[in-house]
Structure formats: C-alpha cells, structure tokens
Design a protein with these regions (language model features):
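N-terminal membrane-targeting/pre-transmembrane regions
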Residues: 1-36
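Short hydrophobic/aromatic-rich beta-strand segments that constitute the beta-sheet cores
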Residues: 73-77, 97, 107
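Conserved beta-hairpin
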Residues: 51-89
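A membrane-cytosol interface segment of integral membrane proteins
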Residues: 108-149
Length: 149
C-alpha cells in the first residue's frame, strides 16, 4: 500500500491563509499610512474574503498520514498550526466495527489495551477522493466483515 498523505492540500490552505494575512496588513498600511484619503470601502475589500474562510473554521484542516504496519495500519493526525499529534494503530485484532458519523469523518470502534471498546473519529474531509478510497479499502482489508453499529 502506498502511504496516504494529505500534506500538500493542507499546506496549500496554510499558505493561502498567510497570503490573506499579508493582504490585510497591506490594505491597512495603504489605507492608514500611505493614502489616508482613500475611501473606507477599501477596508470592505480587505475583509470580504473572510466569509470564504468561515467554512474552514468549522472544518479545520488536519494533516493525516496513514502507513501500512504489521497486520494493519498506523494513522497519524495533527491539526494545522498544532504540535500535538494523535496516533492510532488499527489491526485485525482491535478493529471491531464502524459507527455512524457525519460525512466529514470515518468512525471506528476499536478495542484498547484493556479490551474496552472506544470510538475514534478520523477526519477525512481534507483527503483527496482517491486517498479516501484507498483508506477505506485498507480498512476493508483489515476487517472485511466489520459491521456498521
């Protein structure tokens, strides 16, 4: 299995946020320092794109890296601009079933080290479609009879 990684897509969003921040700084410098006599409608042009980013605040991007490991796969996730990383080992011995979630996540019921069932959500909304299908296929290979609970 090829590694599943969405680093490129999330990095494009990160640099778009950086560019937008520089755009806002430039508009404020231009309006208040270079040409204070310009109309205030220019400030509206600086803040209009923020409404395009509103959906991304709700659906904040995460880095997802899934690699094949012995008898299963290792899934690492990390939020954008965060240092904390979460790892999840999915094997045929601990993967019990799926549970129903929204269209942004895959819900997995996994056994922990004390043999207690835990629910884990994997955010897949920032994956490309072919990577999402590869992840689902690998989960199907690990446990082809996993029911939806």
């Amino acid at each position: 299995m090829k590694d599943i990684n969405n680093k490129g897509k999330v990095n494009r969003f990160k640099f778009l946020l950086y560019f937008y921040g520089l755009f806002i700084v430039f508009i404020f410098v231009y309006k208040f320092l270079i040409a204070p006599d310009t109309p205030s409608i220019l400030l509206l042009a600086a803040f209009a794109p923020i409404f395009g980013f509103m959906s991304s605040i709700v659906n904040w991007p995460i880095y997802l890296h899934a690699v094949e490991a012995e008898d299963g796969m290792l899934i690492n996730t990390r939020k954008l601009f965060s240092k904390k990383q979460h790892s999840l080992m999915v094997t045929k011995y601990n993967f019990d079933s799926y549970y129903e979630t929204d269209h942004l996540h895959i819900g997995l019921n996994l056994l922990d080290k004390d043999d207690k069932m835990q629910q884990h959500k994997i955010k897949v909304s920032w994956l490309r479609l072919k990577d999402l299908r590869a992840l689902e296929e690998k989960l199907r290979d690990i446990n082809p009879y996993a029911p939806m609970k």
